[in-house]
């Protein structure tokens, strides 16, 4: 019996025991903080309508309050006291829109207005719509997917401070408090159950995977114009009958996940800035990249990034190389020169308007994404063909809300070329990606549900043509959000047509439930089925219909620092897929997240 317990510990369940005490301790601390914060001055949650801005998450939905001021005014006014609130009062909890699942999902539940003291967004004006994701930093609410996107400068005002751990969010170093540091930390534990991993091609029997991630960051602001940010991260992974941990994305000794300098100021009527170093990049639609949600080591990039914000228009330019995490030794991550992302993203906010008694806001985004990949592949008639690729991807996205209708629609065309390995033949590329999500928000119903439909058309190639013919398969190599189409990641966003209902609702102010049932076909039967956007399965089925993927995700924000979520999906593979070697199966994911 003792040996059995020891084997389970080695398999990965043992590491779960260590974080339990950490989670319990954090919950107690957080509860204490909430109890103290019950009398902390907050902006009245019943703020005037002029202080409320409708928020969306990449074409998704969330109404939260956002107060910004011109750069020459103080952004930290003394806050009016609100009514006393208990630890479990949902008004004291940050909105769920800062969760990575929400950021990646094609629609996000509508949230009731929250006090601005529970938002830590930068001075981005109308682009703080969408919980800040419209600004290009990922979602930013109480916390952010990208920790340096949080703005805690309001704590410069003594009346906004409390006695909780938030004191570590604003540590001044000079009398004027213009030089200060913000500390952050995160622990995440994920538990995966795959009944038939990779449609049964990876594991025929159930796989149990367990992952742990620790990170700690320090954000040093030196006056108004300079900031230095550094973040350390470590990840572990284990389980029973587990798979897929090679390459450094799941198991990593402690290393520098981010380290950059930013210089910013005001010029030509805009807030401008430049960043150089290693950083997380999320200024792209969730169906292009969401930073890689599942692996313990998210994507980080090395290079340059510049941005400018005007009143209704912003632009972001970037030239980045992916961090190489393959070395298992601590502090040995390096620039991955073989993988490059470059381009520009622009967004224009149309004037706000009223429709059906609802405040409405629409954004028009135009972008260009360039990829250079030294290691890539396309499917052949019997197996995959290794090589390298260059892709140019211009696109447009129009999203927002018009009254009760909430929508996101986009189109991308992709050119470039693919060259087979060992100086093999070169093929030109011409591919496309069309998508649309439309929902109606029943704002007066219980849980304020949004009921809609999502559809995608992503082109595929023809593996039966000659080795020099034009390739039509669309490529999204940087891990689109798992919550966009398929939580189990059994199907990738290439050679896909999908359509299905989407329902989002908020049973309580600190819980969310998302339901969807996409039905998936191949765009063309002349191309393979993909398990991610850049790798195809080896089986070659007949027929276009691939699978039906009913799935759900429930999230509970227990305290300001502690969040639990559980997602489930069943892959009903088509008869043609099963006959070619695939299997149907269940997928379950549980997550515990502690954020400071």
PLM regions: where:
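N-terminal periplasmic/intermembrane-space "pro-region" immediately following the signal or transit peptide
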Residues: 2, 31-204, 217, 451
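Transmembrane beta-strands of outer-membrane beta-barrel pores
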Residues: 187-195, 232-238, 278-282, 310-312, ...
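Predominantly the C-terminal beta-signal and adjacent terminal strand-loop region
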Residues: 559-591, 595
């Amino acid at each position: 019996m003792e040996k059995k317990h020891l084997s389970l510990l080695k398999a990965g369940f043992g590491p779960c025991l260590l974080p339990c005490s950490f989670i319990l301790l954090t919950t107690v601390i957080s509860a204490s903080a909430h109890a103290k914060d019950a009398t902390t001055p907050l902006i009245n949650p019943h703020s005037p309508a002029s202080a409320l801005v409708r928020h969306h998450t990449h074409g998704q939905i969330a109404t939260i309050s956002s107060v910004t001021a011109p750069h020459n005014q103080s952004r930290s006014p003394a806050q009016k006291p609100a009514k006393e609130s208990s630890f479990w009062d949902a008004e004291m909890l940050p909105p769920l829109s800062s969760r990575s699942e929400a950021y990646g999902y094609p629609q996000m539940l509508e949230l009731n207005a929250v006090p601005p003291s529970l938002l830590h967004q930068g001075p981005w004006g109308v682009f703080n719509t969408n919980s800040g994701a419209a600004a290009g930093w990922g979602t930013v609410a109480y916390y952010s997917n990208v920790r340096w996107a949080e703005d805690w400068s309001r704590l410069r005002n003594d009346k906004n401070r409390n006695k909780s751990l938030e004191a570590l969010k604003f540590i001044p170093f000079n009398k004027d408090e213009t030089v200060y540091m913000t500390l952050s930390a995160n622990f995440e534990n994920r538990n995966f159950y795959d009944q038939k991993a990779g449609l049964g091609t990876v594991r025929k029997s159930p796989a149990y995977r367990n992952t742990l991630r620790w990170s700690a960051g320090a954000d040093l602001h030196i006056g108004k114009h300079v900031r230095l940010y550094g973040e350390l991260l470590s990840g572990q992974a284990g389980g029973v009958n587990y798979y897929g941990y090679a390459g450094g994305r799941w198991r990593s000794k402690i290393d520098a996940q981010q380290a950059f300098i930013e210089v910013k100021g005001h010029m030509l009527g805009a807030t401008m800035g430049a960043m150089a170093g290693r950083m997380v990049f999320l200024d792209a639609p969730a169906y292009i990249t969401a930073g890689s949600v599942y692996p313990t080591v998210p994507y980080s990039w090395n290079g340059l990034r510049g941005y400018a914000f005007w009143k209704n228009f912003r632009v972001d330019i970037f030239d980045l190389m992916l961090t190489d995490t393959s070395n298992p030794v601590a502090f040995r991550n390096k620039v991955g020169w073989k993988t490059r992302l470059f381009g520009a993203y622009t967004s224009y906010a149309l004037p706000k308007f009223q429709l059906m008694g609802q405040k409405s806001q629409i954004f028009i985004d135009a972008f260009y994404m360039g990829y250079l990949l030294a290691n890539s592949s396309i499917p052949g008639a019997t197996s995959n063909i290794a090589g390298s690729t260059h892709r140019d991807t211009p696109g447009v996205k129009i999203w927002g809300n018009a009254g009760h209708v909430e929508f996101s629609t986009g189109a991308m065309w992709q050119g470039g070329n693919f060259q087979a390995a060992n100086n093999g033949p070169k093929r030109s590329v011409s591919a496309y990606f069309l998508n649309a999500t439309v929902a109606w928000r029943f704002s007066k119903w219980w849980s304020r549900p949004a009921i809609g439909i999502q559809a995608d058309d992503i082109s595929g190639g023809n593996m039966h043509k000659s080795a020099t013919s034009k390739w039509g398969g669309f490529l999204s190599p940087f891990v689109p959000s798992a919550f966009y189409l398929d939580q189990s990641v059994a199907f990738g966003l290439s050679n896909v047509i999908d359509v299905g209902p989407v329902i989002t609702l908020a049973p309580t102010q600190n819980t969310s439930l998302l339901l969807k049932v996409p039905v998936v076909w191949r765009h063309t039967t002349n191309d393979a089925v993909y398990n991610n956007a850049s790798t195809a399965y080896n089986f070659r089925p007949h027929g276009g219909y691939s699978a039906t993927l009913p799935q759900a995700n429930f999230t509970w924000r227990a305290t300001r620092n502690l969040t639990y979520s559980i997602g489930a999906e069943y892959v009903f593979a088509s008869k043609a897929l099963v006959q070619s070697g695939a299997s149907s199966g269940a997928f379950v994911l549980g997550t515990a997240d502690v954020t400071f």
